Amino acid sequence: MGCIKNENATQAETGQNGLDFNPYDIMEPRAPGKTPKNMQNGAPVKTHDVAPQGVYQPDYNILTPHMRSPEYVQMSTAAAITLGVNKGRMYRCSCTRCLNLLLTYPEGCRANCAYCGLARHREAERDYADRNFIRVDWPAVPMDVIVDKVASDGAGSPFHRMCISMITHPRSDDDTVAVLKKWTSRIDPETIPVSILSNPTTMGREDVKLLKDLGADIFTVALDAATPELFDRTRGKGVQSPHKWAKYWEVLEDARDIFGPEKFGVHLIAGMGE
């Protein structure tokens, strides 16, 4: 017995004449909308200043508590399930091996990348900690809780790597250092290595070196867009965002020099018009 029903449908043509092909001009990013002043820079969250109570699960129906890194970080749903702060099970496996940590602030990320769920132009839609990042919820968890849980597992920890993801915010560089120090004060980076997903816009060579000196093992740069033109169009001036192709490459080359072969990398997204 089969469960596939033949609907007499034929496969659409592939390539430039296919239904799923999006020409470059159609993929032009929408102009960022104007956010009302009373919704800018996390104003509702900061004005009401609701104290957080432990782990925060994204909820669009309530005002988000006032949470900031380095005391709080967000993590992927898969990481939260594996850590034990979220209920749930994952298809075909019992856990994720990488603990992804994302810096968080009421003001949110001050960049405005066209495709990102955390972009500045979305700040009127939802509080920052409620926004969808990479399609799933990212609960906010006290850093102390994370370190306590991972340290208590010792050699039996399900995590094989931890990654700190920076955002574009004035505190991001210093708070990445604080999160890294808190982690390495309790957890040996030789046991669970640490990666940095960087924000080159706010960084210099000394920032890269400091992270290496503090125990980071791998340093990555999210170029995302594969060409200078696409980068500027989707992450730079084209969307009123501060990122610059040349600056990203400058920091990437710093990482090459400081972290060495096979210890630095780039994130790219296919399908943005390249």
For every predicted segment, state its role:
Residues 180-189, 212, 252-260:
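Surface-exposed amphipathic alpha-helices with a cationic face
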Residues 265-271:
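Short, conserved beta-strand edge motifs with alternating hydrophobic and charged residues
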Residues 3-7, 18-21, 28, 33-112, ...:
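N-terminal [4Fe-4S]-dependent radical SAM core
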Residues 121-145, 152-175, 190-207, 211-249, ...:
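Core AdoMet radical
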Residues 176-185, 220, 273-274:
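Short, electropositive alpha-helical surface patch
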Residues 227-228, 271-273:
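Short, catalytically relevant binding-site loops at active-site mouths
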